[in-house]
Amino acid sequence: MSRKLFASILIGALLGIGAPPSAHAGADDVVDSSKSFVMENFSSYHGTKPGYVDSIQKGIQKPKSGTQGNYDDDWKGFYSTDNKYDAAGYSVDNENPLSGKAGDVVKVTYPGLTKVLALKVDNAETIKKELGLSLTEPLMEQVGTEEFIKRFGDGASRVVLSLPFAEGSSSVEYINNWEQAKALSVKLEINFETRGKRGQDAMYEYMAQACAGNRVRRSVGGSLSCINLDWDVIRDKTKTKIESLKEHGPIKNKMSESPNKTVSEEKAKQYLEEFHQTALEHPELSELKTVTGTNRVFAGANYAAWAVNVAQVIDSETADNLEKTTAALSILPGIGSVMGIADGAVHHNTEEIVAQSIALSSLMVAQAIPLVGELVDIGFAAYNFVESIINLFQVVHNSYNRSAYSPGHKTQPFLHDGYAVSWNTVEDSIIRTGFQGESGHDIKITAENTPLPIASVLLPTIPGKLDVNKSKTHISVNGRKIRMRCRAIDGDVTFCRPKSPVYVGNGVHANLHVAFHRSSSEKIHSNEISSDSIGVLGYQKTVDHTKVNSKLSLFFEIKS
């Protein structure tokens, strides 16, 4: 053996050539090296619910009960993001969203070096397999072990996983191991809780800053993108206008003509259309007259139908508080245009027009309530609706002013009732079984012309074998992630509704991310599942004198 060859073998042995694969071998399919990094004093942001503002500032602790960050055992952890405005969106109390309250945003920082490991996929089974981890132990528990940190930490004291916050968004979501998260120092960034029932208003005002640098979706000019509105002023002006409207002679007379619950829906809409036209003659709403020509939503028939539908939902004994607001507000196609009224007010006082539009909307809904038997004082009903419509205005306005992105359909879109829906990729349309773990499926949704609502989604399930991961199922609109409220119905179907109103069309696209969890490796056969399609429900329409939601069905395939 030559000296040169011996030296080469010796160097190869010292460098590990011929030894077992390195920590990163096989990881390229799940790890994005270009977005992974090591940082000293790594910081991120976390949104906290009302009631936990004081406790979180004392340090991060794993909750003893609840979801502990996620329903899926693999993904239980402390969640944060690089965008403080996105973090603010998690400060609302989901159990009592109509309280008006919000918590806070905190900045959390690790001491020393932290490795951020960026993932390309969110399928825990695939990640564990490609990284050579145990397939039976929860992913995030393994991330906190010394072995994992030694293999993937590049000399750092800990490893934090990262995933895109939502499709179309440049923000990132960080998943921290609970034990590792105890080392985080906590600093208050902004406190919404001190505003009481106005906390959510402060939160939305704060979040509006997030899109300050994005180009406006509409063509009226960039100066209207993310307008800095004073919501307290708008609320006060709105309530003043409502009182003025109620005492106005013609409006007062029209209110006295309000039909009762027994009147036909057609007569009810006719009355509300007349009421709408009468209200527009009020001098306090003079600015709106100059905008009506470019905003079709001010057609009386639209307002009338909207008000009737809102009233019917409010009157329902089975609807919960969330459904009585967000569901009601997303019934009528085109109602999203109300939120874009400021875009038609180029030469006017935008804040004034916003207040006027909310006042008129509130009065219409309050006047519709008696039509279905809800005996509520008109002022009280209108004031409560002010809270809801302001929140709706903010949510949709912020969504519309985010940069639009190409839907990137890779399968033929299904066109129906003005909507266009498709699977993102062929792989998304396949539900694979025969393994424990989770899979994500993306659906692209848009509308051909007028903005249309996405009211809810119906997902087929097999309890105990194929369940919906409620915490990871969401919908994103132009990069803004909106969580969904899901509940099981009829045992084998899960019903999910966006927690904030969602509209698509006119350049606005939505990405629905459905996450399924398999607690068993048992194979699933197609005849076991109640339906072979996912249903997307849109606006309400009347078919054979019966109200139904527009429904789009996307068929999937079961494979083992």
Swiss-Prot record:
Residues 1-25 form the signal peptide. It comes from Corynephage beta. Keywords: Cleavage on pair of basic residues, Disulfide bond, Signal. This is Diphtheria toxin homolog CRM228. Pfam families: Diphtheria_C, Diphtheria_R, Diphtheria_T. One of its GO terms (molecular function) is NAD+-diphthamide ADP-ribosyltransferase activity. NAD(+) binds at H46, Y90. GO terms for cellular component: extracellular space. Disulfide bonds join C211-C226, C486-C496. The active site is at E173. The keyword Cytoplasm does not apply. InterPro entries: Diphtheria_tox_rcpt-bd_dom_sf, Diphtheria_tox_transloc_sf, Diphtheria_toxin, Diphtheria_toxin_catalytic_dom, Diphtheria_toxin_rcpt-bd_dom. This diphtheria toxin homolog is a nontoxic cross-reacting material (CRM) produced by a strain of corynephage beta that had undergone N-methyl-N'-nitro-N-nitrosoguanidine mutagenesis. This treatment induces guanine-adenine transitions in the DNA; the differences from the wild-type sequence at positions 104, 187, 222, 456 and 532 can be explained by such mutations. Either of the first 2 mutations will completely abolish all ADP-ribosylating activity of fragment A. The last 2 mutations may be responsible for the reduced receptor-binding capacity of this protein. In wild-type active diphtheria toxin, fragment A catalyzes the ADP-ribosylation of elongation factor 2 and blocks protein synthesis in eukaryotic cells; fragment B binds to the receptor protein and is necessary for the movement of fragment A into the cell.
